[in-house]
Amino acid sequence: MSESNSQIDEQGAQTYSSHPPRIVVQPNGAYVVSGKVRLTRRFRVFNDDREPIAWRAGEDFLIVDEPYKLCRCGLSKTKPFCDDSHETASESEWNGTITASHAPRSTRQKIYPGTGLVMTDDEILCGGYAFCDRFGTVWAEIEHVSDPAVRAHLTEQVSLCPSGRLEYMLALNGAPVEIKYEPMIAVLHNGPYWVLGGIPIEAPDGQVYPVRNRQLLCRCGKSKNKPFCDGTHWDIHFRAE
């Protein structure tokens, strides 16, 4: 088991700037991060059965320049920062075309009603981090959510989902129940950027995606739902560290 099995305590986390944070996706290029957004690391914590049960905080990166650029092509030699490797990459190595829809989540999500709780699932956002699979999966649990123990498991699992694929609310058409995060970006081990705290993501054409509390941005360069992660980094065995 990892040295820690508790969730990250976001209380008292340092706020880096009062300026509005923002991430701009450059055409066939990097992510440009402004607003002095904290850049850190996060690691999954596993139990003895190798099931992910929590997130562990890692060290912060020292940010010297503002704004800063994060690698999007997966080829930089200075990961997670961009070194302009995308400019010399071949077409087979890198295609930064944005493919993710700007349509609201409500147009794609599946709704799973339960007793006193509603779960929604926007599957295209899945990054494959598997918090949803414990206790027989959240899709099975929702049918028994009137049981307080099952309800506690499900709400924790949904909240741990880094991509925001899963959300829950207390009533249909209610507001999603979310942990309040400071705006920050967490680099996941050999995986995507975990964007927390409702940071706007601006596409190369200037359109801003619907703002979400939990988002995963592709770092391997091969997602079919760019700029968002679709779990392809697992399939290609992406190695950044």
Which residues make up each language-model segment?
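Cysteine-centered iron-sulfur cluster-binding motifs in ferredoxin-type domains/subunits
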Residues: 24, 70-80, 118-136, 148-164, ...
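Extracellular/lumenal glycan-associated surfaces
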Residues: 30, 34-36, 80-86, 134-137, ...
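A cross-kingdom feature marking solvent-exposed beta-strand/loop segments within repeated
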Residues: 47-67, 202-215
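Short, solvent-exposed interaction modules
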Residues: 107-127, 134, 182-211
